[in-house]
């Protein structure tokens, strides 16, 4: 009998059909075709039993198919993965969200006095994107914490806190350390992960599986949008007993149902983005991204992707922080990408963009279809617009981040960079 060892079950899909998950302090001893599991803790039983589980991964899902690389494949899979995370959970006819993985903890979750979302990297950005809707629907304080910093500070955690841990793999070391800390403080914990057998999914009290499927590319693309939707669904579910929020919840639930088709519309921008990267962007090594409100998280995620995949310096800035220092840089004509889709902050964002144009900047504006405010500037060649469908404000970031994924991808391709295996990555390399 052969045994394979891996930190990621997806890498084993082509070799095995059954897996055994080791837990903390387990020691696996393989000898002469046999597996024995022991515990390293003093006083524990010498031999342990761990359940053999079926590995439910389709080999076709971890192949590139007709795409050139995994990142491109996974960007295009977002039409389907956003459906998967909502399938069986969002009911547009009754305007309800059903999350079976949380039902047993309903009472404890709805009496939360504070919600803390803890994550790292792109998962941290998805938490930032969802924070405003949690605050609006739940009417309780909501904190978003970087997992490493959270543990370093020994944050105050109380028994009536609800801590949400978000991770693509479910094995992020810093996030697991934060989870262990919160468990010791007796807080209620929720896991939002893609891998059902992962450490975070097993150690949290309850959770939501994002059903994203394997993500072989190093860059987080489809997991980001699936996490975003999963967090919005949790906010909708936890606020179901608030009568004052009924109409707002209906609006969001109806908008959720058409997000997959709207993503398909956004992906139609790819030819324009390829041309934009080829003619205007590939010669630059500094980018500025502007956003406010829900779109600041989009700016953070977009800047992160450009650094990680395209190897360019990119900085995300709140639009009202566009002071003289940033405007002085803008006059040197680095590409500026501004999120100007319709929401409560649209007038102020428009004012900032006008200041950039006055200083001879040439911003790239992500706006809604039919937005005519910069039509004259567009005809003069002062701006470039990337038009995306309009949706409810708390979901607009799902659509807005996809042009940035495509820009990062095509900038890397134009520079002959391997997008599936960026240099100096701290994550495990995909099986390419």
Swiss-Prot record:
Residue ranges that the Swiss-Prot or TrEMBL entry lists as coiled coil: none
Transmembrane feature ranges: none
SUPFAM superfamilies on file: SIS domain (SSF53697)
Gene Ontology process terms (BP): fructose 6-phosphate metabolic process; protein N-linked glycosylation; UDP-N-acetylglucosamine metabolic process
UniProt domain SIS: residue ranges: 105-244, 277-422
InterPro entries in the cross-refs: GlmS/AgaS_SIS, GlmS/FrlB_SIS, SIS_dom, SIS_dom_sf
Keywords linked to the UniProt accession: Repeat
GO MF annotations, alphabetized: carbohydrate derivative binding; glutamine-fructose-6-phosphate transaminase (isomerizing) activity
Stored Pfam families: SIS
Source domain of life: Eukaryota
Keyword Hydrolase among record annotations: no
PANTHER family: GLUCOSAMINE--FRUCTOSE-6-PHOSPHATE AMINOTRANSFERASE, ISOMERIZING, GLUTAMINE--FRUCTOSE-6-PHOSPHATE TRANSAMINASE (ISOMERIZING)
Protein name according to UniProt: Uncharacterized protein EC1118_1M3_2531g
Taxonomic placement: Eukaryota, Fungi, Dikarya, Ascomycota, Saccharomycotina
């Amino acid at each position: 009998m052969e045994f394979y060892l891996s930190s990621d079950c997806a890498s084993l899909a082509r070799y095995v059909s059954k897996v055994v998950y080791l837990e903390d302090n387990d020691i696996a001893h393989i000898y002469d075709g046999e597996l024995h599991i022991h515990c390293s803790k003093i006083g524990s039983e010498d031999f342990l039993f761990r359940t053999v589980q079926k590995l439910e991964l389709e080999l076709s899902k971890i192949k590139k198919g007709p795409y050139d690389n995994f990142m491109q494949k996974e960007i295009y899979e977002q039409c389907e993965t956003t459906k998967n995370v909502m399938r069986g959970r969002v009911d547009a006819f009754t305007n309800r969200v059903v999350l079976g993985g949380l039902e047993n903890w309903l009472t404890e979750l709805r009496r939360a006095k504070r919600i803390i979302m803890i994550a790292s990297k792109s998962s941290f950005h998805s938490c930032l994107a969802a924070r405003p809707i949690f605050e609006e629907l739940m009417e309780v304080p909501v904190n978003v914490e970087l997992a490493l910093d959270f543990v370093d500070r020994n944050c105050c955690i109380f028994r009536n806190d609800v801590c949400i841990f978000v991770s693509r793999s479910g094995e992020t070391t810093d996030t697991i350390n934060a989870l262990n800390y919160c468990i010791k403080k007796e807080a209620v914990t929720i896991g939002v992960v893609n891998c059902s057998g992962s450490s975070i999914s097993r150690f949290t009290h309850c959770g939501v599986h994002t059903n994203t499927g394997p993500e072989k590319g190093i860059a987080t693309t489809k997991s980001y949008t699936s996490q975003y939707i999963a967090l919005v669904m949790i906010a909708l579910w936890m606020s179901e007993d608030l009568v004052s929020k009924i109409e707002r919840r209906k609006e969001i639930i109806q908008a959720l149902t058409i997000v997959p088709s709207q993503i398909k519309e956004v992906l139609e921008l790819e030819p324009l983005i390829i041309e934009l990267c080829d003619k205007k962007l590939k010669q630059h090594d500094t980018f500025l991204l502007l956003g406010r409100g829900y779109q600041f998280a989009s700016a953070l995620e977009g800047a992160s992707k450009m650094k990680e995949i395209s190897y360019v310096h990119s900085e995300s800035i709140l639009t009202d922080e566009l002071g003289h220092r940033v405007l002085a840089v803008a006059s040197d004509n680095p590409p500026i990408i501004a999120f100007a889709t319709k929401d409560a902050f649209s007038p102020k964002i428009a004012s900032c963009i006008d200041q950039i144009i006055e200083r001879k900047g040439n911003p790239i504006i992500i706006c809604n279809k039919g937005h005519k405010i910069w039509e004259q500037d567009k005809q003069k060649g002062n701006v470039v617009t990337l038009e995306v469908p309009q949706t409810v404000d708390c979901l607009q970031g799902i659509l807005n981040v996809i042009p940035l994924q495509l820009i990062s991808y095509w900038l890397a391709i134009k520079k002959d960079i391997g997008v599936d295996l960026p240099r100096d990555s701290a994550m495990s390399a995909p099986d390419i």
